[in-house]
């Protein structure tokens, strides 16, 4: 099993060094809080000063990131009261820890490195026969995913959010059920929508406890798989309740919060109202499949071979109504958020302006690509996971994307990671090729971000980003 040892440590070191290089250049060029950092960094700095009664109403998330990142500074402040003779040193250290540079560094290195190690360990648990080399390359590819890698070195919630979801999953895989629940609580404190992925981890954990060897010959085994799990859950209900009560309590507490709060977000509710944007789920499927284009768009892939081996009549019988449904979704459930149209710093602005927003014909023309991508993703995951897990993964992906009006690629990060970890690992050649492609993309994106700024009419400097 690819577990622990030098490979996991080497992977973590490599990823940490990459984030450190990005941090070095951003610290030299982008010295002030950028984009949403303008909300996250001042809020954390308030907590660093012990002012927990201060809150910016424009912030939409729970304060998990700010609380965690304020802890080192608060410890230093406490140390200065215990050792007053060294208080000037403590004051300087506390300032550095909560500076723009310090917060970005801790966020990228700690959570970026943790996600890398957790990815490696999860691959070893889910795929016991995987070699250390293959686990290294597959985990590296996941952590180089350009949308994630770019965001991890900003003071955003993405890096910590993913790390805690992966920690909850790994602990569940290792039968540390209550610890997994605690990690899930942390994940939700970083980002509310992680309650959906906490539910996925719970479903995965329950399935493995009552039907540990449950595999299927495809989605046709869903009724049988569901029957086994329901029977097993009833028989072992007392044990399951003892093991998973923390995650269940989290779900109940979050439901109570939503009912009392009148929504999921904490602040800026008018701009973040849930709306049915089903087309975004299709974008998510295409983006995730496109990220592993060497796998999903390989003419020799298992999915393509399955299509080629099936009768044309059967393929047409299944594909035609699905394609019609996809076209209907695109026509009726495509939304565009005012932020997408107003902010030309984001690549999504240009995706909409130059293609998606040009006409309905342009959007509908992508329906076959969306269908192929979704089919390939389902087929690949179903090769290694039981039907209920496949269904749960895609249901959670839909829940975290299809209710968001804003076209935002960062919403796809967790599904990309979960799908990549639970699916059949890429071959060594394809994993290496994916790493190379991601690395090249990251270098290009970073160069544009740092060295190709432009000026807004008000004279402020703007930079291209996801």
State what each model feature region is.
Residues 1-24, 314-315, 385:
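Start-transfer (signal-anchor) and selected internal transmembrane alpha helices
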Residues 28-43, 52-72, 411, 455:
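Extracytoplasmic catalytic/substrate-binding loops of multi-pass membrane glycan-assembly enzymes
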Residues 43-47, 55-97:
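Short hydrophobic/aromatic helix or loop-helix immediately within or flanking a transmembrane segment
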Residues 187-188, 194-351, 442-455:
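Membrane-lumen/periplasm interface segments of specific transmembrane helices
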Residues 34, 147-160, 408-409:
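Short acidic/glycine- and proline-prone juxtamembrane loop motifs at membrane-interface regions
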Residues 8-16, 311-324, 390-397, 427-452:
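Signature aromatic-anchored transmembrane alpha helix within multi-pass, membrane-resident enzymes
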Residues 74, 101-128:
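Transmembrane-helix motifs of polytopic, lipid-linked glycan transferases
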Residues 138-140, 146, 166-171, 177-192, ...:
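Membrane-interface alpha helices of multi-pass inner-membrane proteins
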């Amino acid at each position: 099993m690819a577990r622990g040892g030098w490979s996991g440590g080497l992977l973590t070191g490599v990823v940490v060094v990459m984030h450190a290089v990005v941090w070095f250049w951003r610290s030299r060029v982008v010295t002030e809080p950028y984009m949403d950092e303008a909300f996250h960094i001042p809020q954390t700095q308030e907590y660093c000063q012990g002012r927990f009664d201060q809150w910016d109403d424009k912030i939409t998330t729970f304060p998990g990131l700010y609380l965690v990142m304020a802890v080192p500074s608060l410890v230093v402040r406490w140390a200065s009261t215990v050792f007053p003779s060294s208080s000037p040193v403590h004051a300087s250290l506390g300032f550095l820890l909560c500076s723009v540079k310090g917060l970005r560094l801790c966020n990228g290195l700690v959570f970026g490195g943790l996600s890398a190690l957790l990815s490696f360990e999860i691959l070893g648990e889910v795929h016991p026969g995987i070699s250390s080399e293959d686990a290294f390359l597959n985990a590296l590819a996941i952590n180089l995913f350009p949308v994630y890698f770019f965001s991890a070195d900003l003071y955003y919630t993405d890096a910590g959010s993913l790390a805690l979801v992966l920690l909850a999953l790994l602990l569940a895989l290792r039968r540390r059920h209550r610890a997994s629940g605690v990690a899930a609580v942390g994940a939700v404190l970083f980002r509310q929508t992680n309650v959906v992925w906490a539910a996925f981890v719970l479903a995965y954990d329950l399935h493995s406890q009552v039907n540990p060897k449950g595999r299927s010959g495809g989605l046709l085994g869903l009724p049988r798989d569901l029957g086994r799990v329901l029977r097993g859950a009833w028989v072992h209900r007392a044990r399951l309740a003892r093991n998973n009560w923390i995650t269940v309590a989290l779900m109940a507490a979050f439901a109570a919060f939503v009912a009392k709060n009148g929504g999921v977000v904490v602040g800026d509710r008018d701009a973040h109202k849930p709306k049915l944007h089903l087309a975004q789920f299709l974008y998510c499927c295409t983006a995730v499949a496109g990220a592993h284009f060497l796998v999903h768009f390989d003419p020799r892939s298992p999915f393509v071979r399955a299509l080629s081996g099936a009768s044309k009549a059967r393929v047409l019988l299944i594909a035609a109504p699905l394609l019609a449904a996809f076209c209907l979704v695109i026509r009726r459930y495509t939304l565009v958020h005012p932020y997408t149209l107003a902010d030309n710093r984001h690549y999504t602005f240009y995706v909409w302006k130059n293609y998606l927003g040009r006409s309905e014909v342009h959007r509908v023309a992508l329906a076959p690509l969306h269908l192929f991508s979704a089919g390939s993703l389902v087929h690949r995951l179903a090769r290694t996971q039981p039907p209920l897990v496949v269904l749960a993964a895609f249901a959670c992906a839909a829940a975290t994307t299809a209710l968001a009006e804003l076209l935002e690629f960062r919403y796809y990060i967790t599904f990309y990671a979960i799908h990549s970890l639970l699916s059949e690992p890429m071959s060594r050649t394809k994993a290496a090729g994916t790493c190379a492609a991601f690395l090249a993309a990251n270098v290009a994106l970073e160069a544009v971000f740092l060295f190709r700024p432009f000026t807004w009419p008000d004279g402020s400097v703007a930079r291209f980003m996801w």
